[in-house]
C-alpha cells in the first residue's frame, strides 16, 4: 500500500524512492509486525482470559503440563493480525505471490480458529472432526496450487530444484500441483504437531522464515540467481516482505510465549504459519530445502506417523509418547531443555540449508 503512495510522492521528493527498495521495506515490515505484536499482546491475552479461551491438555501427557490447563490459547490471532497489517503496508500488492501466501495464511487461520473453538467448547483436545479439518485444508491448498500453476506453467516457477545439483531442475508439469498440495498441507500439520511446548514451534518458524527471506531475495534477483545456479523467479522478491513480517510477528509473540508461556498460539497460529511457510517454499522452488531447514518439524510429524503405524500393526509403541518432544519430557528432560535443544538443532539445519545453495 505504501509502495503506491511512495510512487506518487516521489515526483515531489525523491527521498520517497527509498520505499521501492525491498531491503528497506523488509526491515520496516519486520519492525512493524514486531511493534504491533508487542503492542496488542497484553490486550489480546486479557481478552482471551475474559472469554475463557483456555488451553485443554491431554490427560495421558506429562504431569508437568497439567499446570498449563487454562492458559489462554488462540494467540495466533495476534500473529496473523501483525503479519496482515505489516504486509498490507509494506508489500507491493500488485504481486500475485503476496496474495497466494495471504490466502493460505488466513484460510488456514480460519480452519485453525474453528478447530480451537471446538476444543474450548467441548473442553477436550479433539477439536474439529478430522475429516472436515483435512477437507478444508485440502480445498484451500488445491485452489492455491492450481492458481500458482496457472501463473508459472512451463517456466522456472514450476521446476524442481534439487540441492547439491546445479543443473538438475526437471520441469514438473501437472505434478507441480500434487507436490504443492502435499508441501502446504504437510508443513501446516507438521508445525501444528510441533507446537506442544512453550516457544518450541515459534522460534524454528522464525529461523526458517528468516532463511527463506534470504532465499526469496536471491531468487528474485537475476544476478544472484545466476550466481547461485537457482531459478530466477519474477515475483519471488516480494516474498521477502512476507518472510520478515513473519519473523517480526513471531518475535512479538515469543515475548509472551516464552517459558513459562502467558499464551499459546493454538491451531489458528500453527496451521496458518505452517501453511504459509510451505507455500513460500513452493513459490521460491525450494521444497526440498524446506525438508532440511524444517527438519525439526519433519521429525515431529514422522514420530507421530511411526507411533500410530507401529501401534496399529504391532500393538507396540516406538516412543513413550508422540510427538517426539513429549518422549523426551517423559524421559526426564525439563521442558526448557527440550525447547532450547530443538532450537539449536533448527539453527544448525538452517545454516546447513543455506550452505547447500552454494554447494552445487
UniProtKB/Swiss-Prot annotation:
Entry GO MF terms: metal ion binding; phospho-N-acetylmuramoyl-pentapeptide-transferase activity; UDP-N-acetylmuramoyl-L-alanyl-D-glutamyl-meso-2,6-diaminopimelyl-D-alanyl-D-alanine:undecaprenyl-phosphate transferase activity
Enumerate the PROSITE patterns for this protein: MRAY_1, MRAY_2
Family as reported in the entry's similarity comment:
Belongs to the glycosyltransferase 4 family. MraY subfamily.
Taxonomy, superkingdom: Bacteria
Q: Which InterPro entries match?
A: Glycosyl_transferase_4, PNAcMuramoyl-5peptid_Trfase, PNAcMuramoyl-5peptid_Trfase_CS
UniProt keyword Membrane, yes or no: yes
**Location in or out of the cell:** Cell inner membrane
Fetch the NCBIfam families from UniProt: mraY
Catalysed conversion reaction: UDP-N-acetyl-alpha-D-muramoyl-L-alanyl-gamma-D-glutamyl-meso-2,6-diaminopimeloyl-D-alanyl-D-alanine + di-trans,octa-cis-undecaprenyl phosphate = di-trans,octa-cis-undecaprenyl diphospho-N-acetyl-alpha-D-muramoyl-L-alanyl-D-glutamyl-meso-2,6-diaminopimeloyl-D-alanyl-D-alanine + UMP
Which pathway does this chain act in?
Answer: Cell wall biogenesis; peptidoglycan biosynthesis
Keyword annotations for this protein?
Cell cycle, Cell division, Cell inner membrane, Cell membrane, Cell shape, Cell wall biogenesis/degradation, Magnesium, Membrane, Metal-binding, Peptidoglycan synthesis, Transferase, Transmembrane, Transmembrane helix
Where does it sit, as one GO cellular component term? plasma membrane
Q: What is this protein called?
A: Phospho-N-acetylmuramoyl-pentapeptide-transferase
Among Pfam families, the record links this protein to:
Glycos_transf_4, MraY_sig1
Which processes are annotated in GO (biological process)? cell division; cell wall organization; peptidoglycan biosynthetic process; regulation of cell shape
Q: Where is this protein primarily located?
A: membrane
Q: What is its EC number?
A: 2.7.8.13
Native organism is Glaesserella parasuis serovar 5 (strain SH0165) (Haemophilus parasuis)
Q: What would be the name of the gene that encodes this protein?
A: mraY
Q: What class of enzyme is it?
A: transferase
Task: Write out the function statement from the record.
Answer: Catalyzes the initial step of the lipid cycle reactions in the biosynthesis of the cell wall peptidoglycan: transfers peptidoglycan precursor phospho-MurNAc-pentapeptide from UDP-MurNAc-pentapeptide onto the lipid carrier undecaprenyl phosphate, yielding undecaprenyl-pyrophosphoryl-MurNAc-pentapeptide, known as lipid I.
Question: What are the names of the required cofactors?
Answer: Mg(2+)
Q: Which residues cross the membrane?
A: 21-41, 73-93, 98-118, 132-152, 168-188, 199-219, 236-256, 263-283, 288-308, 338-358
Q: Does the keyword Lipid metabolism apply?
A: no
Look up and give the membrane topology term: Multi-pass membrane protein
